[in-house]
Amino acid sequence: MVQLLLRYGRRHPLYAGLLLACAAVVSLPLWASQKSKTQAVPEQWEMSLDGGRKLTWEHSFSSEQEVKPNRSFWNKLADVIAGAPDYHSLVRPYSVVSDSHGRIIVTDPGAAGVHIFDFAQHKYKFIQRWGKSRDSMLAPQCVAVDAQDNIYVTDSTAGVIFVFEPNGKFVHAIGSLKGGEGYFKRPTGIAVDSAAHQIYVTDTLRDEVFVLDMQGNILKTIGKTGDGNGEFNLPTELRLVGPNLMVVDALNFRVQVFDRSGAFLYSVGKLGDSPGAMFRPKGIAADSEGDLYVVDGLWGMVQVFNQQGQLLYYFGSSGTHAGEFQLPAGLFIDHNDQVLIVDSFNRRVQVFHYAGLKQPVREGAQ
């Protein structure tokens, strides 16, 4: 190997670099090529529930690199010479959804963009809108998809809803008027009812839920400022579940449930530190049996309620391991009961699977 370096190194520096890299691999000490006896065991987490139900942690992800197929030896060798490629990573993720093809879409206010993870096809895309005179993406918050997998993203700072095609191509912005002013103060939660051709959006500062047509025209609003039934104090996330609309009423420390016309039905939660109480409710979703999952960002846990508002169980604690959270935020459950939870401060999305009784899916069109 030394003779080869002396012979070719001066005339062919690139060859010299490759030879050096190969030499480094070949000359590794014996202990480095053996598996460590103290090798970390893959993390596991599982919760057994009544009636044979089970909630299982599957994996977590945080960067583009985890979507890509395993790199070959020659790719890794090239990385030694030229440097490893730069991969996009989650910075301050907030909201999550998955589309009909299983792609996972994550908003990231910290990166001022939206990540699309396609594990099935080993593809990744990052959506940004910078340097636009109008409709620049500044602080993407919540995300939803329609029946055609078009992507809808609220931006709480820009005060608009960005609409993208499934491939990430920008379509238009909703809520921005010609003069630059808009009718949203701080749009946050969003859900799309494709069958009714309607979009539901919470405006946190207006204490209202806007109901729009697909062109962005206002059809009606739901709610007003207050702490009574049908009134809000900084509403944030929302979700369509079967015939109902569920809204996180953050500073009233509850989730309110309406029918889709806006008529109040009931509420879940209250301020407190006992099971069933809420302190900082964030993401919400429902599984195939209609049970309601509510993230509490401050407590680092998820509480699960039945359709009568009774607490069934809760899971999670503060930490960095499987099933542990630091400032969890968005939550989404797909039609296969895959549970996606944004673990914001840990800069990752944790993936669980709920094995229940497999009743018909109650989740509304997103």
Stretches found by the model and what they are:
Residues 2-18:
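Bacterial N-terminal signal peptides that target proteins for export
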Residues 31-366:
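Eukaryotic scaffold repeat domains enriched in small/polar residues
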Residues 3, 24-27, 242:
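N-terminal non-cleavable signal-anchor helices
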Residues 15-27:
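Bacterial N-terminal signal peptides
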Residues 6, 29-30:
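N-terminal regions of proteins, emphasizing targeting and processing segments when present
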